[in-house]
């Protein structure tokens, strides 16, 4: 029998339908009838017939025709909103689609699983879980650890031992002993009272990461959660039922209490929840629509769900993966700019970097060689200026290995810390089953990921800083020898004039965002928690910095490709031509001014989805595998003694006569 969940004036009603041929209008009237039945004053209606209403889908808020049959208009268990004529939309009714921050494709229910053991999760895995590519299951070893850990908690409760967070209050109330009869109530109160965050909800991708990471930490077996409860949490994740988690409210010690409490609040069937099937609705109805029941917390389980650094580190995983992606692609974009500006490749000579062998610097120089080696990848643009009188390029071109290189090394350093953190137990107290006891400690303190993510923001920002200067060189005719702002009929057309201003604005904003949040601390919880990390803000602003970097490089990518138009019919190297073709598949050349924002967004999408890297990477790896000797063209810019000797001894043509 089909059943629908209907929202009427703040009330959620389950309405079964015995005949699928009944109409949307019938569903609305039946929902209103049930609403009136539950109200002492009939909800202000004399009868159901007096009600005038519209029916909308909760997901997308699409308006439905009252005459359409239910089996045509709706799916079983779908969520709908009945809007009474004269009423505004219910003030507590949240828009059905949370604000997106990722430019990824729409959710499709995954078929593959990732087995979590609490020890081997990678940042790549967590981001894939966030995108909805996988479901979760536990390894047998993890299940055994969780069971043994829970046995310790059960024994503490049975023996009425006084242990923090299990039989006592929290924070300032740590010395308040709670009666056994109220231990479960204690856990529910903890979750409800700590759900006090503010701001926009996390996107589905980020909420999935947060939930998946909490599952991974619980799978380590040091938190005392029962196996049954943990499996319920996994079922919620696999159904993509995602609680409403405000992005603001954590100080990063004791863990990320507010956001994780909101996460747990949805699991117990309270607050709001979102799923691809339902949109936003009350958590208990979203769970019911997926055949799930709210979790009933046992002693210690509320604390087990909310104490840890998972908000910081889940966002940190996204930050480090996006930083890695844009850092790789920044080399490709800069190489294309160098070609357009007719720069020299000699600054990327292996001997230069062998005497200063930072790993990132060496790798960036190699990537430039693999893309620009004109012997391996003939470039008509490079040939056109092989014997020019330019001695060396500006720092923004010549020093890319040194500037981009340290960004790569920064990312590697941060990734190591984040990888350790996502596989760490950050609860308190910790349950050590092998010792049969609990120990209070400070693993919940977010200083490690907070400091690392502040460092990440500072490092990655430099990619935008140097990119903006390259955009200036592309747009400035005195530096590029190209039309001003990369457009014909300058004056009538403004070209990239304001796109460059946008890049400058983003770089300036990043300079403020790069101020470390982890240098701040405020005493909280009546001075019990008297030093905190502010890691939540470190993670959120790192992501903002990275997004700005992506957008600046998107503008540079567009500008470099537009510069190519003024060098035609000359061709660049094969890999860079492939990059040009990729960009032109989504953004056409500028013949005259047009609405530019969609083009910047399209280029940004290419970078976020790593399409630029996918096009160039095969050429880079082929170059690496073949160990191709680098090109050292005979050119004045290389200071070749052999060339200078030939030049000084060559007989001028006029003397041949």
From Swiss-Prot:
GO terms for molecular function: histidine ammonia-lyase activity. It catalyses: L-histidine = trans-urocanate + NH4(+). It comes from the Eukaryota. Pathway: Amino-acid degradation; L-histidine degradation into L-glutamate; N-formimidoyl-L-glutamate from L-histidine: step 1/3. GO terms for cellular component: cytoplasm. Pfam families: Lyase_aromatic. There is a cross-link at residues 253-255 (5-imidazolinone (Ala-Gly)). Contains an active site 4-methylidene-imidazol-5-one (MIO), which is formed autocatalytically by cyclization and dehydration of residues Ala-Ser-Gly. Signal peptide: none annotated. GO terms for biological process: L-histidine catabolic process; L-histidine catabolic process to glutamate and formamide; L-histidine catabolic process to glutamate and formate. The keyword 4Fe-4S does not apply. The modification Phosphothreonine is found at residues 396, 637. CDD domains: PAL-HAL. Keywords: Histidine metabolism, Lyase, Phosphoprotein. The modification Phosphoserine is found at residues 635, 648. Its EC number is 4.3.1.3. The modification 2,3-didehydroalanine (Ser) is found at residue 254. Belongs to the PAL/histidase family. This is Histidine ammonia-lyase. The gene is HAL.
């Amino acid at each position: 029998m089909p059943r629908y969940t209907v929202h009427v004036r703040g009330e959620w009603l389950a309405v079964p339908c015995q005949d699928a041929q009944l109409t949307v209008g019938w569903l609305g009237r039946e929902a209103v009838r049930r609403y009136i039945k539950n109200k002492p004053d009939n909800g202000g209606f004399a009868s159901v017939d007096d009600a005038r209403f519209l029916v909308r889908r909760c997901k997308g808020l699409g308006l439905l025709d009252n005459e359409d049959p239910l089996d045509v208009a709706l799916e079983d268990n779908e969520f709908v909103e009945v809007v009474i004529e004269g009423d505004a939309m219910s003030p507590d009714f949240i828009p059905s689609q949370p604000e997106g921050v990722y430019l990824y494709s729409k959710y499709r229910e995954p078929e593959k699983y990732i087995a979590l053991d609490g020890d081997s999760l990678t940042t790549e895995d967590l981001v894939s879980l966030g995108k909805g590519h996988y479901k979760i299951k536990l390894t047998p070893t993890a299940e055994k650890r969780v069971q043994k850990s829970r046995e310790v908690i059960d024994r503490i409760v049975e023996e009425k031992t006084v242990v923090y967070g299990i039989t006592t209050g929290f924070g300032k109330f740590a010395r308040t002993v709670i009666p056994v009869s109220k231990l479960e109530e204690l856990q529910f109160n903890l979750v409800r009272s700590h759900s006090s965050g503010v701001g926009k909800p996390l996107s589905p991708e980020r909420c999935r990461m947060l939930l998946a990471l909490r599952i991974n930490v619980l799978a380590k077996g040091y938190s005392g959660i029962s196996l049954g409860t943990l499996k319920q949490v996994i079922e919620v994740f696999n159904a993509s039922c995602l609680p409403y988690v405000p992005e603001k409210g954590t100080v990063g010690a004791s863990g990320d209490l507010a956001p994780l409490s909101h996460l747990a609040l949805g699991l117990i069937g309270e607050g709001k929840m979102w799923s691809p099937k339902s949109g936003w609705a009350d958590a208990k109805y979203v769970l019911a629509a997926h055949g799930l029941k709210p979790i009933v917390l046992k002693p210690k389980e509320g604390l087990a769900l909310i104490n840890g650094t998972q908000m910081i580190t889940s966002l940190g995983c996204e930050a480090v993966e996006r930083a890695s992606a844009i850092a790789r692609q920044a080399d490709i974009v800069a190489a294309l700019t160098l070609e357009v500006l007719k720069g020299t490749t000699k600054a990327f000579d292996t001997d230069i970097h062998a005497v200063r062998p930072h790993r990132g610097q060496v790798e960036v120089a190699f990537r430039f060689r693999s893309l620009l080696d004109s012997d391996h990848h003939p470039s008509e643009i490079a040939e056109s200026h092989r014997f020019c009188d330019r001695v060396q390029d500006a720092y923004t071109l010549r020093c890319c290995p040194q500037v981009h290189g340290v960004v790569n090394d920064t990312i590697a350093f941060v990734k190591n810390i984040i990888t350790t953190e996502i596989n760490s137990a950050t609860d308190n107290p910790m349950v050590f089953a092998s010792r049969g006891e609990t120990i209070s400690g400070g693993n919940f303190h977010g200083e490690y990921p907070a400091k690392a993510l502040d460092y990440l923001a500072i490092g990655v920002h430099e990619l935008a800083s140097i990119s903006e200067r390259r955009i200036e060189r592309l747009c400035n005719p005195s530096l590029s020898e190209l039309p001003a702002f990369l457009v014909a009929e300058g004056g009538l057309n403004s070209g990239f004039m304001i796109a460059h201003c946008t890049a400058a604005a983003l770089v300036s904003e990043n300079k403020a965002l790069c101020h470390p949040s982890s240098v701040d601390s405020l005493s909280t919880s009546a001075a019990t928690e008297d030093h905190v990390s502010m890691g939540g803000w470190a993670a959120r602003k790192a992501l903002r910095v990275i997004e700005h970097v992506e957008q600046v490089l998107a503008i540079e990518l567009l500008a470099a490709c537009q510069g190519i138009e003024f060098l035609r019919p000359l061709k660049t190297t094969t890999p860079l031509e492939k990059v040009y073709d990729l960009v032109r598949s989504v953004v056409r050349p500028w013949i005259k001014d047009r609405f530019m924002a969609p083009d910047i967004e399209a280029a940004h999408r290419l970078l976020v989805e790593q399409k630029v890297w996918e096009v160039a990477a095969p050429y880079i790896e082929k170059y690496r595998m073949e160990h191709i000797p680098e090109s050292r063209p005979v050119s004045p810019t290389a200071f070749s003694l052999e060339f200078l000797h030939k030049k000084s001894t060559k007989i001028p043509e006029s003397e041949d006569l």
